Amino acid sequence: MPHTGQAGVNQLGGVFVNGRPLPDCVRRRIVDLALCGVRPCDISRQLLVSHGCVSKILTRFYETGSIRPGSIGGSKTKQVATPTVVKKIIRLKEENSGMFAWEIREQLQQQRVCDPSSVPSISSINRILRNSGLWTDEMTSSQQNAAAAAAAAAAAAHQAGSGPSNGYGGQAPPPPVTVAPPTPAATPSIARYAKPPALMMNSAGEMPIKPAPKMPPSMGHGHSHGLNPNVSGLDLSYSALHKHWLWNPSLLYYTQAHIQAQAAASGGQFLPYAGGYLPHAMAAAAASSTSALGGFTKSESSIDLSTPGAAGDALSDCDSGKSSPAALSLTASGGGNGAGSAPEASPGSTLSHSRKRNPYSIEELLKKPEKRLRLDSNRLECLESSSCESSQDSPVAPPLETPEDEDPAEAEEEQEEEDSVEVVN
């Protein structure tokens, strides 16, 4: 009879089949040699069988008198769930459906149905109940103990007459849900550290910034939510600021050239490094002068330092957001706009042309031979004619003729400056 399994060779050179017992002929030979007084070590060398196998076979023969191999597959299972025990377990569960497995196990021991050594385990009782259809929960013993304690507490509270009969079938009712006001500890970090709604600006830029309505401090909580627009801890809205601080970015970009122009216009002393920022009084005076003069003049020319103003030089209007602090003109007259502005200028206003040139301006950079702007004659004629027509309408017109003593590059620069004034205005 061929044996199926993994064949191998032991240390003595004998062939064996792993997991299968020795043939009966080999077993009989081992027992016969042992009865003749041969030592087990000599038997193993003679029959090419390992010493452990010889010892095991001889030990079983001396104990039982049999040479048959033992059972394969481990120890024999203990049969504790007899039909009598199974019927008793099912009867106890039918009598009391709320009884747990550990209670059934105690009842089996108290009623002398099972001995302490043969009583089935809790898992065996649960398996019996599950197979019989009386147990559907997959609870462990610890969960059953916790549920039993909760059920006992609920029954004690019910018997004490704490309240009317509830509809939970003898089980503990769920704890009452109390809605507490939100606290900073319970609030998510995103909502807790979110900015107030007054400071949230539209990232897409579809709507302009509008002043938020002021809210009384009593309506604010200790924290602000991003979802509630009516809650704000502090009044940080744009309505608390002045209009000129909101819509005049030139007040924020107050450069050294503006301070120098202000000092020259008011006759005060100019300190180049003394004032690192604009004082509030000077900014307010500049804002009031801009509202009194009725507007600003935008051009790409340099700063005019010759014309003094009554309340200070005017700042350029930056509502459109297209002009930068480097391209601002502070040309202001006593009661009107700049000379290149339009026919609304008063006839008595005079404007001189002493300008402080910026070495980094476009005009100065265009003076270099490699970067000089080349204009064709047709475009130059068109610009000259348009500037002449507009300057004839104005009472005060800057001269467009180039004197003989001026350099052609300076004449071209003057022409470009006047053209830029006309185009911007």
Curated annotation (Swiss-Prot):
Residues 84-132 are annotated as: RED subdomain. Residues 8-64 are annotated as: PAI subdomain. The lineage of its organism: Eukaryota, Metazoa, Ecdysozoa, Arthropoda, Hexapoda. Keywords: Developmental protein, Differentiation, DNA-binding, Neurogenesis, Nucleus, Paired box, Transcription, Transcription regulation. It comes from Drosophila melanogaster (Fruit fly). Its main location: nucleus. Pfam families: PAX. Residues 159-188, 297-358, 383-425 are annotated as: Disordered. This is Paired box pox-neuro protein. The keyword DNA-binding applies.
